[in-house]
Amino acid sequence: MNILLLAPEPFYEDRGTPIAVALILRGLSERGDLVDVITYHQGSEVKYEHITVHRICNLRFICNIRPGFSWKKLVCDIFLFVKALRLVSRKRFDLIHAVEESVFMALILKWFYKIPYVYDMDSSMAQQLVEKYSFLRPFRFVFKYFEKLAVKNALVVMPVCDALAGSIAEHMPKKVAVVPDVSLLTDLN
C-alpha cells in the first residue's frame, strides 16, 4: 500500500507526537507498506525500510517549534501543504495518514484527488484553540464545524482515548478506532 503520512511537527524529536509517528512508521515499515512522510525542516533523521522522509524547505527564521498552536506551526503547515500537493500530483497514494491539524490538508486532498484519509487525533483542535486563546470563543462554532467536516469525511478516526472518541461521536464518524498511547520503556531507534 502506498501511504502519504502528514506529520506537522519536527520529526524526529524525543517527545509526544513524534514518538507516536515513529511507532506508526515502524509498524508500517515492518508490514511492507511504502510510506512517504512529509514533515517540518527540524528534527533528527530516522531510517526505516520502505519509508521516505520529505522535509519542508529550511526556514532558518523558525526554530524551537513547540507542541500546540503557534504562528511558527502555521507557517510550516503552509509549506507542508504545498509539498503535499506537489507529491500527490506526481505519485499515486492509496491512503493519507493525517496527524492532528494536517487532517484539513488531507480533507482538501481527498476532495481534489479522491484519496481517503485516516485522522490521527490527539486532541480536539476546536477546544484547544478556544481554551488557549479566549478571544476566539465567539468563533467556537466555526472551529467545531471544520472539526466535524474532518471527522465525517475520514475513512477512520483514531483518537488517543475514549473521552476524545466520545466527544466526536456527535459528528457521526464512519469508523472510530481508539489507539491509546503506549509505554515507551524501550528505545525507538
Regions found by a protein language model. Name each.
Residues 1-44, 156, 176, 180:
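N-terminal subdomain of nucleotide-sugar transferases
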Residues 14, 77-81, 95-127, 162:
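An aromatic- and histidine-rich active-site surface loop
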Residues 23, 82-89, 104, 108-112, ...:
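Membrane-proximal helix-turn-helix segments that form the acceptor-binding/catalytic region
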Residues 44-53:
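N-terminal beta-loop-helix "entrance" segment that forms/cooperates
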